[in-house]
């Protein structure tokens, strides 16, 4: 079995029964179930949702996205072996820990396969809920260029690279392109202030202005739960991105929940504690791959400058990355997943065939 066979690169062509277009994102694809299948599964499986709640099958891939591009490796390797299963396993672990600690629910109702979630359709809050405990990455790059205000928060002078901040900073950005909001540029992923959100809470999809405080509380609590757990395995939770949305429970009550993934190497930076204390950074996240790309290409500005997107897309399309770099990243994902969950990630020989089999035989979602 070749590496390419073990990688799930294309995840939007599964024969899952649906009457709507498949939504294909950078890493995950979403298959909206028919009303009949949603009602049937809710009844058969006893999901704690309204009887008419729309459900979806969310399938993760092994594709690797960085700097808004999808990258590939030598030998026609179109993803990172084990990446999808590792990300899902980590998210599953944190969502369970959130539940154990009395935090909000997630959109996940069932886990038929390591690559697959059955989820309840949520109304997304249009915010990338980012929080930072250390100054690094894009914030550090902006700081070195003289910026001191981030999302309405003023940072002090004389901070050093990778330094722990005095408090957890909430630095939200827009999710997608939002139009007609005063003071918010109509571009994707632009930083916003709390006042931006308060003044336009409905345009960010909050049901009421009070829910802004609820989302901030859930963000801080979720960060704290993960940070505490990572400390026990000698890892530092540096920064992360959460996403939130609204669903209705079985009684028809609206509630704010966590959605997408949480605390993964894709959505977070995770550092090795011992290395950090000795003055070194060992990245146990996708950030190491980003740094590899910046060092690999002679003109890293292409990867950082949003005015050079066409060049960036061409760079990703025309360059197969060294196999060693792809496998190093695979090891990063598999190792940190095993540390966090306490169990090794088993690579599937043919993930697509396995997914089809379980959805056909156990969920009757494949004709």
From Swiss-Prot:
Listed GO biological process terms: 'de novo' IMP biosynthetic process
Q: What is its EC number?
A: 6.3.2.6
Organism superkingdom: Bacteria
Which Pfam families does its entry note? SAICAR_synt
Q: InterPro entries given for it?
A: SAICAR_synt/ADE2_N (IPR028923), SAICAR_synthase_Vibrio-typ (IPR014106)
Catalyzes what? 5-amino-1-(5-phospho-D-ribosyl)imidazole-4-carboxylate + L-aspartate + ATP = (2S)-2-[5-amino-1-(5-phospho-beta-D-ribosyl)imidazole-4-carboxamido]succinate + ADP + phosphate + 2 H(+)
- Tell me a GO cellular component: cytoplasm
Q: In which pathway does it act?
A: Purine metabolism; IMP biosynthesis via de novo pathway; 5-amino-1-(5-phospho-D-ribosyl)imidazole-4-carboxamide from 5-amino-1-(5-phospho-D-ribosyl)imidazole-4-carboxylate: step 1/2
What are the record keywords, sorted? ATP-binding, Ligase, Nucleotide-binding, Purine biosynthesis
Q: Do you know which Gene3D superfamilies this protein is assigned to?
A: ATP-grasp fold, B domain, Phosphorylase Kinase, domain 1
What GO terms are given for molecular function?
A: ATP binding; phosphoribosylaminoimidazolesuccinocarboxamide synthase activity
User: Could you say which protein family the record assigns here?
Assistant: Belongs to the SAICAR synthetase family.
Question: In its UniProt entry, what is this protein called?
Answer: Phosphoribosylaminoimidazole-succinocarboxamide synthase
Question: Which gene name does the record give?
Answer: purC
